[in-house]
Every structure is written in structure tokens, then in C-alpha cells.
């Protein structure tokens, strides 16, 4: 099984994080992750995209260091790395989560 790579907190790059946050769908996923402990592609039913597209967006969030994945059987459970983001970029996540959706 392929174990996903999660960047260490000390290696998070602001440009990668901001790039990941530059997409409205990924912003919605980050908001959902902030409200829930974990999410899977199937629990994001309100997001109207193909499962493969959703998986791609979760991959971008994971590779940027915003999200982490836990694999259990065939399921991938995604969660927000809020503490790591706060440590690396204080206030960034809070600022992003407080922006009204009409300003995305």
C-alpha cells in the first residue's frame, strides 16, 4: 500500500499553502475539515464534483500540508492540520476560515 507523504511542519511552504487555498472548492473542503474531525470523499456529498476530482483536491491539500490522511482499509480519512498550520503561519487558517464565501 502506498503511504501518503505529509510534509513536516518545519518544511511547510507558504507559497504551496496559498496555492492550495486559491481554489474555491479546496477552500470549501478546508472549511468542512475545520468543522468535522475527519472527512472522506463519500462524506463530502454536498460537493458537486466527480470523486476523482475530489480526490485530486484532497491530494493538493495533503501535499501542501493543510490536510493529512489516515488510511483504514480502502478508506482515506482526511483531517485538517490546524495546529501545524498555526505553528508555521500564525493566524493564516483563522483568517481564511473567517472570510465570507462570497469573497472567495
Curated annotation (Swiss-Prot):
The keyword Nucleotide-binding does not apply. CDD domains: HTH_ARSR. One of its GO terms (biological process) is regulation of DNA-templated transcription. The keyword Transcription regulation applies. It comes from the Bacteria. SMART domains: HTH_ARSR (SM00418). Residues 40-63 bind DNA. Keywords: DNA-binding, Repressor, Transcription, Transcription regulation. GO terms for molecular function: DNA binding; DNA-binding transcription factor activity. Residues 6-100 form the HTH arsR-type domain. PROSITE patterns: HTH_ARSR_2 (PS50987). InterPro entries: ArsR-like_HTH (IPR011991), HTH_ArsR_DNA-bd_dom (IPR001845), HTH_MetalResp_TranReg (IPR051081), WH-like_DNA-bd_sf (IPR036388), WH_DNA-bd_sf (IPR036390). This is Uncharacterized HTH-type transcriptional regulator YczG. It comes from Bacillus subtilis (strain 168).
